[in-house]
């Protein structure tokens, strides 16, 4: 799972921002890093920043990424104003899925199950919280944030023959600003 490149706008100013120049450069770097794998399956969140991050690798492999809502970013609660979304997210990131309630526990479980049920080696372009949801689901850790994943970091999971998912490698961490 790859976190998208840096977005051009923050969570409190845009619902679906594109990548900025640095984000586009990060996308090319991760594509160059993964090019030799030559897998046959790419999945991306429907959000622009993930689709744009997937483009360089998909082009190298001559693939069309499959857009899946199952790997989308955590939804903000209904009724939270755009300008208040970042405050909600930063507060949520300090706690657990259980603190947020059953809707969010279900989000974590659904994204973990989706990844667990993928049968072939796949690159998934997704989001900070979504990738952490899978990490937590695999490790049995209820915290929203387990890894401070940098933009375009690569987190590797492995699925065994019986369908068990394990964390092989956490992505590169940084003091990522959630904006």
Residues covered by each model-derived region:
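Short, high-confidence coil segments that cap the C-terminus of an alpha-helix
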Residues: 39, 119-120
């Amino acid at each position: 799972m790859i976190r998208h490149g840096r977005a051009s706008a923050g969570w409190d100013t845009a619902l679906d921002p594109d990548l900025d120049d640095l984000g586009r450069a990060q996308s090319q770097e991760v594509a160059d890093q993964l090019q030799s794998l030559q897998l046959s399956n790419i999945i991306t969140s429907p959000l622009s920043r993930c689709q744009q991050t997937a483009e360089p690798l998909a082009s190298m492999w001559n693939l069309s990424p499959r857009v899946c809502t199952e790997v989308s970013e955590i939804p903000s609660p209904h009724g939270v104003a755009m300008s208040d979304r970042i405050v909600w997210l930063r507060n949520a990131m300090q706690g657990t899925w259980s603190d947020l309630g059953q809707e969010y526990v279900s989000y974590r479980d659904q994204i973990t199950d989706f990844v667990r049920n993928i049968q072939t080696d796949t690159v998934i372009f997704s989001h900070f919280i979504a990738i952490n949801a899978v990490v937590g689901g695999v490790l049995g850790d209820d915290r929203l944030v387990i890894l401070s994943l940098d933009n375009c970091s690569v987190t590797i999971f492995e699925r065994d023959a019986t369908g068990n998912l394990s964390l092989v490698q956490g992505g590169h961490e940084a003091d990522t600003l959630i904006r």
